[in-house]
């Protein structure tokens, strides 16, 4: 039985900027693999029995290497788990979401991107600046 992996963008830092779909994925996940840049308050929406795995990376301080994260996502997906891969910002903007998707696709594990609000859009909006003027 194969599960499902959601590659979720948590937005630019304000927990209220995560998408409704992102929150729904967190709420139903069996496993949440989260990054350093994803606000820990988002984990409050996790089920009490959800497995929480920190996979944060900072400059020269990696809890897990990217290949280990890829393997973990594949493993949990193949175990039939619903996995929320929670990343700061958007998974496809410097989030290595493409690499994770490639590993999942090659392993035959279904996945879906859940885009996040990106900081290039959110930051000017907080300053009441138009993007297209």
Predicted segment positions?
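Alpha-helical segments flanking ligand/cofactor-binding loops in enzyme cores
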Residues: 23-24, 74, 102
């Amino acid at each position: 039985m194969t599960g499902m992996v959601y590659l979720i963008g948590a937005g630019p830092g304000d927990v209220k900027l995560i998408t409704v779909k992102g929150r729904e994925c967190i709420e139903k996940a069996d496993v949440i693999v989260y990054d350093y840049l994803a606000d820990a308050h988002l984990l409050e929406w996790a089920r009490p029995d959800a497995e929480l795995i920190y996979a944060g990376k900072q400059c020269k301080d990696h809890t897990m290497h990217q290949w280990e994260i890829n393997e973990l996502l594949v493993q949990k997906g193949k175990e039939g788990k619903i996995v929320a891969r929670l990343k700061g910002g958007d998974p496809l903007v410097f989030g290595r979401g493409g690499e994770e998707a490639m590993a999942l696709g090659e392993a035959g594990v279904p996945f879906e991107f859940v885009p996040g609000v990106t900081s290039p859009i959110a930051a000017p909006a907080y300053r009441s600046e138009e993007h297209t003027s």
